[in-house]
Amino acid sequence: GTPDAGGTWSGPSAVIGGLIDPATMSAGVYTYTAAGTTPCPGETATVTVTINAPPFPGTDGSITLCSTDAAVDLFAQLGGTPDAGGTWSGPSSVVGGMIDPATMSAGVYTYTAAGTAPCPDETATITVTINTPPDPGTDGTITLCSTDAAASLFAQLGGTPDAGGTWSGPSAVVG
């Protein structure tokens, strides 16, 4: 409608200029009173104000896992006290909020906490890094004559061992 200007507001918080500031004012019933002109009495109308809090998805985080580690709860990696019941998205499908480094991909996983209108959804991310365990190769053997030239121990390992490891044994190994 078209209420008469110049009325007064009353309610749970002081109204200045007919404006409600959800950051500083309380929710509740606000009453607008339009003054009457004799012999007509003043009339009132009300506005019920609901103020929804925005969702809190937590704060961004990161985790580094080994591909042989057990599954980890992504929700526990969010900072703060995030709202429960949100949804996960990322490079792999997240089931039950868990990431299994043996079967899922590294990357950025997004947690979305649903907002209650008119508050929008909010998101936080977890950056997941998945490292592979070192590969020392498989056991090997070598038989040498004491007059043979030096031989590479690394070449005696089976499989595809990672370079750059360290050696230990009954004698110092150089190189």
What are these regions (language model features)?
Residues 1-175:
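Proline- and Ser/Thr-rich low-complexity, intrinsically disordered segments
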